[in-house]
C-alpha cells in the first residue's frame, strides 16, 4: 500500500537514524514509515529534525538537536563541513565510515547482480588525512572585491572560501595563502563562468609524497599574468621544494579545468 505523505515543510519530528545514503546523509523514518534524509546525522543518533524539503515519497531534514548521540559520532574538525561538497563523513569515526562503505558494496552486489557473497573488510588508510597529492581550487571575487578560493559547495558551483583542507598536505595551505596574496596585490581579475570574463580561473597544485616536490599551476582565461615574476619569486621564497610553476591557458566556455 502506497504511503500517504503527511509531513509538511517546517514540521518538527524526533526520529532515530538507522541508515546512511551514498552521499553521507543519515536516514530515519517517521511514525508513518516515510523516509527522511538528514545531513550531519549518524546511525544510532536520535535527533530532533526540522523538515526543509518535502517530495512525493520522502523528505529532507535538518538536525536541530541531537537528543541521543550515536556511538559512531565524533566532533567535527573542519570549519566548512556541510558547506563544502568534499567530505560527508567528518562527523563519524573512521571505522564507522569504512563499515558504511563496506555495506554499500554488499548492497550493490546483492541489488545489481543478485548475489549474496562474502565481502572482505575494507583495508583502511594508515593515515586518513593529508593524503591527497593534487588539489584544484576554483576562485571568485566576493562583493567586497576580495579573492575567495576553496571548493565547490555540495551539488553547486558556489565557491566555499577556505584557507585549508584536512585531506591535503599542509604545504598546500601555504601555496593557497601565497597565491591569494599575489592576486590581491596585483589586482588580477578573477574569472566569472557566467559572463566568461576575468582572467584567473583555478589554482591547481600537485605534491610528490616521496620527493616532497611541489608543482603550482594557475589556470587562466588568457595568455599571461600581470607580473609572473612576482608570483614565481613569492612562491620560491615561501614554498620549500618548489619544483615548477605553470601557467595553463584555458579560454573555452567549459567546466573542464585545464586547457
Task: Name each model-derived stretch.
Residues 2-259:
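Accessory RNA-recognition modules of RNA-modification enzymes
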